[in-house]
């Protein structure tokens, strides 16, 4: 299930380390599911509500929580592709997610 909408109480308090990446999707499996109808990848950009994202509905039936993307962004989202931030329902453009910004820089 997607981390944001897993059934409450089904799992004990989980640390981020226990979250797996959501299902692969898109051409050649190069994308990751970010929500039931969202498939994104660095090389692909994002597919929303298209055939490439159909597989992402399967994630709703898996019991363990997942979260795709490395860097948090926006309101409860993760960087999904260059310049794009997605949560499990939608995506927005996000300069923080541009290439080269994917890893927090240590001062």
Swiss-Prot record:
Residue spans crossing the bilayer: none
Record-stated family: Belongs to the vasopressin/oxytocin family.
Annotated PROSITE patterns: NEUROHYPOPHYS_HORM (PS00264)
Subunit composition and interactions: Interacts with vasopressin receptors V1bR/AVPR1B (Ki=85 pM), V1aR/AVPR1A (Ki=0.6 nM) and V2R/AVPR2 (Ki=4.9 nM). Interacts with oxytocin receptor (OXTR) (Ki=110 nM).
Keywords: Amidation, Cleavage on pair of basic residues, Disulfide bond, Hormone, Secreted, Vasoactive, Vasoconstrictor
Function per UniProt: Neurophysin 2 specifically binds vasopressin. Vasopressin has a direct antidiuretic action on the kidney, it also causes vasoconstriction of the peripheral vessels. Acts by binding to vasopressin receptors (V1bR/AVPR1B, V1aR/AVPR1A, and V2R/AVPR2).
First-listed, main subcellular location of the protein, grouped into a coarse class: secreted
GO molecular function annotation: neurohypophyseal hormone activity; V1A vasopressin receptor binding
Note from the entry: X's have been placed at positions 10-12 by homology with the complete sequence of the bovine precursor.
Chain positions of site Important for agonist activity on V1aR/AVPR1A: 9
Modified residues (Glycine amide): 9
Biological process according to GO: vasoconstriction
Subcellular localization(s) per the UniProt record: Secreted
Pfam family name, one: Hormone_4
Gene Ontology cellular-component annotations: extracellular space; secretory granule
Protein name: Vasopressin-neurophysin 2
Disulfide bonds: 1-6, 22-66, 25-39, 33-56, 40-46, 73-85, 79-97, 86-91
């Amino acid at each position: 299930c997607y981390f944001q909408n897993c059934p409450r109480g089904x799992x004990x308090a989980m640390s981020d380390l226990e979250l797996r990446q959501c299902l692969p999707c898109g051409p050649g499996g190069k994308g990751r599911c970010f929500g039931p109808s969202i498939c994104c990848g660095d090389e692909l950009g994002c597919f929303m509500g298209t055939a490439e994202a159909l597989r992402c509905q399967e994630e709703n039936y898996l019991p363990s929580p997942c979260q795709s993307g490395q860097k948090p962004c926006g309101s409860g989202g993760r960087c999904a592709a260059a310049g794009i931030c997605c949560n499990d329902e939608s995506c927005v453009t996000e300069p923080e997610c541009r290439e080269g910004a994917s890893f927090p820089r240590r001062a």
